[in-house]
């Protein structure tokens, strides 16, 4: 419907707050508490690419994917979030900002290893960028 709201979706490819279960965005092959042998698309299905999916809908004014793995990308993320709130304030429609992030604890990695996983695994699967910006119809 083009509601004037902004969603900030933190995508760390896991349900970390509940013990590390598979999420809709868990990558193929990624091990979780509920996929101990890795996510198998033949069994659990493929991950959902949220921005790509929502950008096809009428009523969505902004769909953008960013990351927070280094200072440059943190600044890009801040601008994207601000843009989402501006769209909301100006009644331009629904905005979603997807933020690729880490979960070192439930990924079983050090923070440095987790940042590298975002670079080498998540960004290739979930490319950064603006998927839709502007008219909501």
Regions found by a protein language model. Give the residues of each.
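"Short basic amphipathic alpha-helical interaction patches in structured regions
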Residues: 1, 11, 21-22, 106
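Thiamine diphosphate
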Residues: 1-16, 79-83
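Short coil/turn connectors at secondary-structure junctions
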Residues: 1-5, 10, 58-60, 91-94
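Short, structured patches in soluble enzyme cores that scaffold and shape functional sites
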Residues: 9, 65-67, 98-101
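Short, well-ordered, mixed-charge alpha-helical segments that flank or form enzyme active sites
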Residues: 14-19, 71-75, 103-107
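Short, hinge-like loop/turn segments at secondary-structure boundaries
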Residues: 23-27, 113-116
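Conserved thiamine diphosphate
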Residues: 24-90
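Flexible, low-complexity linker and terminal segments
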Residues: 89-137
């Amino acid at each position: 419907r083009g509601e004037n709201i902004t969603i900030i979706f933190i995508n760390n490819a896991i349900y970390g707050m509940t013990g590390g279960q598979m999420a809709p965005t868990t990558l193929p092959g990624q091990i979780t508490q509920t996929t101990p042998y890795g996510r198998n698309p033949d069994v659990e299905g493929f991950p959902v690419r949220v921005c790509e999916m929502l950008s096809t809908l009428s009523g969505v004014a902004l769909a953008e994917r960013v990351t927070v793995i280094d200072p440059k990308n943190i600044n890009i993320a801040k601008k994207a979030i601000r843009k989402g709130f501006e769209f909301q304030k100006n009644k331009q429609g629904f905005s979603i900002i997807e933020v690729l992030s880490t979960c070192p604890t439930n990924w079983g990695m050090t923070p440095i290893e987790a940042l590298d996983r975002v670079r080498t695994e998540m960004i290739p699967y979930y490319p950064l960028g603006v998927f839709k910006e502007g008219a909501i119809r």
